Amino acid sequence: MLISHSDLNQQLKSAGIGFNATELHGFLSGLLCGGLKDQSWLPLLYQFSNDNHAYPTALVQPVTELYEKISQTLSDVEGFTFGLGLTEDENVFAQADSLSDWANQFLLGLGLAQPELAKEKGEIGEAVDDLQDICQLGYNEDDNEEELAEALEEIIEYVRTIAMLFYSHFNEGEIESKPVLH
Protein backbone atom coordinates (compact mmCIF):
# COMPACT_ATOMS: atom_id res chain seq x y z
CA MET A 1 0.00 0.00 0.00
CA LEU A 2 1.25 3.46 -0.90
CA ILE A 3 2.36 5.61 2.02
CA SER A 4 0.10 8.56 2.86
CA HIS A 5 1.17 12.10 2.05
CA SER A 6 1.39 13.06 5.74
CA ASP A 7 3.33 9.90 6.71
CA LEU A 8 5.79 10.47 3.87
CA ASN A 9 6.17 14.11 4.91
CA GLN A 10 6.93 13.01 8.46
CA GLN A 11 9.50 10.41 7.35
CA LEU A 12 11.23 12.89 5.03
CA LYS A 13 11.36 15.49 7.78
CA SER A 14 12.63 12.98 10.38
CA ALA A 15 15.39 11.89 7.99
CA GLY A 16 16.41 15.51 7.37
CA ILE A 17 15.61 15.31 3.64
CA GLY A 18 15.42 18.63 1.79
CA PHE A 19 12.09 17.84 0.08
CA ASN A 20 8.60 17.53 1.48
CA ALA A 21 6.21 14.93 0.02
CA THR A 22 4.76 17.38 -2.52
CA GLU A 23 8.20 18.46 -3.74
CA LEU A 24 9.32 14.82 -3.95
CA HIS A 25 6.25 13.97 -6.04
CA GLY A 26 6.89 16.93 -8.33
CA PHE A 27 10.57 16.08 -8.79
CA LEU A 28 9.91 12.40 -9.55
CA SER A 29 7.05 13.35 -11.90
CA GLY A 30 9.34 15.75 -13.75
CA LEU A 31 12.01 13.08 -14.22
CA LEU A 32 9.43 10.61 -15.53
CA CYS A 33 7.69 13.14 -17.77
CA GLY A 34 11.09 14.06 -19.16
CA GLY A 35 11.64 10.51 -20.34
CA LEU A 36 14.02 9.18 -17.70
CA LYS A 37 13.71 5.40 -17.91
CA ASP A 38 16.71 4.01 -16.07
CA GLN A 39 17.69 3.82 -12.42
CA SER A 40 19.49 7.19 -12.53
CA TRP A 41 16.47 8.75 -10.81
CA LEU A 42 17.67 7.61 -7.39
CA PRO A 43 21.16 9.21 -7.55
CA LEU A 44 19.55 12.38 -8.96
CA LEU A 45 17.07 12.39 -6.09
CA TYR A 46 19.87 11.99 -3.54
CA GLN A 47 21.90 14.71 -5.22
CA PHE A 48 19.15 17.30 -5.28
CA SER A 49 17.37 16.52 -2.02
CA ASN A 50 20.01 15.13 0.34
CA ASP A 51 23.47 16.48 -0.61
CA ASN A 52 24.35 13.29 -2.53
CA HIS A 53 23.68 11.08 0.49
CA ALA A 54 21.50 8.00 0.15
CA TYR A 55 18.19 7.99 1.98
CA PRO A 56 17.78 5.83 5.09
CA THR A 57 16.84 2.29 4.12
CA ALA A 58 13.37 2.63 5.66
CA LEU A 59 12.64 5.55 3.33
CA VAL A 60 13.89 3.99 0.08
CA GLN A 61 10.97 1.54 -0.22
CA PRO A 62 8.12 4.08 0.13
CA VAL A 63 9.92 6.50 -2.21
CA THR A 64 10.44 3.72 -4.78
CA GLU A 65 6.78 2.74 -4.49
CA LEU A 66 5.79 6.38 -5.07
CA TYR A 67 8.05 6.54 -8.13
CA GLU A 68 6.47 3.36 -9.53
CA LYS A 69 2.94 4.62 -8.81
CA ILE A 70 3.66 7.92 -10.58
CA SER A 71 5.10 6.01 -13.54
CA GLN A 72 2.03 3.78 -13.69
CA THR A 73 -0.46 6.66 -13.57
CA LEU A 74 1.46 8.67 -16.18
CA SER A 75 1.47 5.75 -18.60
CA ASP A 76 -2.32 5.41 -18.25
CA VAL A 77 -3.05 8.33 -20.59
CA GLU A 78 -6.60 7.22 -21.37
CA GLY A 79 -7.54 6.84 -17.71
CA PHE A 80 -5.98 10.22 -16.78
CA THR A 81 -5.41 9.00 -13.22
CA PHE A 82 -2.25 11.06 -12.69
CA GLY A 83 -2.51 13.31 -9.65
CA LEU A 84 -0.11 15.95 -8.36
CA GLY A 85 0.43 14.64 -4.85
CA LEU A 86 -0.42 17.99 -3.27
CA THR A 87 -0.85 18.59 0.44
CA GLU A 88 -3.81 16.98 2.19
CA ASP A 89 -4.41 20.32 3.95
CA GLU A 90 -7.76 21.68 2.80
CA ASN A 91 -6.75 25.32 3.36
CA VAL A 92 -6.78 26.98 -0.07
CA PHE A 93 -3.64 28.99 0.71
CA ALA A 94 -1.77 25.81 1.69
CA GLN A 95 -3.00 24.20 -1.54
CA ALA A 96 -1.70 27.15 -3.60
CA ASP A 97 1.70 26.95 -1.89
CA SER A 98 1.75 23.20 -2.45
CA LEU A 99 1.01 23.61 -6.16
CA SER A 100 3.83 26.15 -6.48
CA ASP A 101 6.24 23.79 -4.67
CA TRP A 102 5.19 20.88 -6.89
CA ALA A 103 5.63 22.92 -10.09
CA ASN A 104 9.09 24.14 -9.04
CA GLN A 105 10.37 20.63 -8.40
CA PHE A 106 8.60 19.25 -11.48
CA LEU A 107 10.50 21.74 -13.64
CA LEU A 108 13.77 20.78 -11.93
CA GLY A 109 13.17 17.08 -12.63
CA LEU A 110 12.01 17.77 -16.18
CA GLY A 111 15.06 19.94 -16.86
CA LEU A 112 17.42 17.27 -15.54
CA ALA A 113 15.82 14.64 -17.78
CA GLN A 114 15.69 17.05 -20.75
CA PRO A 115 18.76 19.34 -20.63
CA GLU A 116 17.68 21.03 -23.91
CA LEU A 117 14.23 21.87 -22.52
CA ALA A 118 14.74 25.63 -22.90
CA LYS A 119 15.06 25.15 -26.68
CA GLU A 120 11.63 23.54 -27.01
CA LYS A 121 9.15 25.48 -29.15
CA GLY A 122 5.43 25.22 -29.82
CA GLU A 123 3.10 23.83 -27.21
CA ILE A 124 5.95 22.28 -25.20
CA GLY A 125 7.72 25.63 -24.95
CA GLU A 126 4.45 27.34 -24.00
CA ALA A 127 3.77 24.69 -21.36
CA VAL A 128 7.22 25.29 -19.83
CA ASP A 129 6.49 29.03 -19.73
CA ASP A 130 3.11 28.40 -18.12
CA LEU A 131 4.68 26.18 -15.46
CA GLN A 132 7.28 28.84 -14.71
CA ASP A 133 4.42 31.28 -14.15
CA ILE A 134 2.66 28.78 -11.88
CA CYS A 135 5.86 28.50 -9.83
CA GLN A 136 5.43 32.20 -9.06
CA LEU A 137 1.80 31.71 -8.05
CA GLY A 138 0.87 34.33 -5.52
CA TYR A 139 -2.13 35.41 -3.50
CA ASN A 140 -3.07 37.84 -0.77
CA GLU A 141 -4.30 36.54 2.56
CA ASP A 142 -7.40 38.71 2.06
CA ASP A 143 -8.23 37.17 -1.35
CA ASN A 144 -11.67 35.61 -1.62
CA GLU A 145 -11.04 31.99 -0.65
CA GLU A 146 -13.92 30.64 -2.73
CA GLU A 147 -12.69 32.37 -5.89
CA LEU A 148 -9.12 31.30 -5.18
CA ALA A 149 -10.27 27.69 -4.66
CA GLU A 150 -12.09 27.70 -8.01
CA ALA A 151 -9.10 29.19 -9.83
CA LEU A 152 -6.76 26.76 -8.12
CA GLU A 153 -8.89 23.79 -9.16
CA GLU A 154 -8.67 24.91 -12.79
CA ILE A 155 -4.91 25.46 -12.55
CA ILE A 156 -4.41 22.01 -10.99
CA GLU A 157 -6.32 20.38 -13.86
CA TYR A 158 -4.26 22.36 -16.35
CA VAL A 159 -1.00 21.29 -14.67
CA ARG A 160 -2.12 17.64 -14.77
CA THR A 161 -2.77 18.08 -18.50
CA ILE A 162 0.62 19.74 -19.04
CA ALA A 163 2.36 16.88 -17.22
CA MET A 164 0.63 14.37 -19.50
CA LEU A 165 1.64 16.47 -22.53
CA PHE A 166 5.30 16.34 -21.47
CA TYR A 167 5.04 12.63 -20.74
CA SER A 168 3.57 11.80 -24.14
CA HIS A 169 6.06 14.10 -25.92
CA PHE A 170 9.22 12.80 -24.24
CA ASN A 171 8.12 9.17 -23.84
CA GLU A 172 6.87 8.38 -27.34
CA GLY A 173 6.22 4.68 -27.68
CA GLU A 174 5.92 4.21 -23.91
CA ILE A 175 2.24 5.09 -23.66
CA GLU A 176 -0.06 2.27 -22.60
CA SER A 177 -2.87 1.83 -25.07
CA LYS A 178 -5.82 -0.26 -24.22
CA PRO A 179 -7.52 -2.24 -26.97
CA VAL A 180 -10.75 -0.70 -28.22
CA LEU A 181 -13.74 -2.89 -27.47
CA HIS A 182 -16.51 -2.93 -30.05
From Swiss-Prot:
GO terms for cellular component: cytosol. It comes from the Bacteria. Pfam families: UPF0149. SUPFAM superfamilies: YgfB-like. Disulfide bonds: none annotated. InterPro entries: YgfB-like, YgfB-like_sf. Belongs to the UPF0149 family. This is UPF0149 protein CGSHiEE_07975.
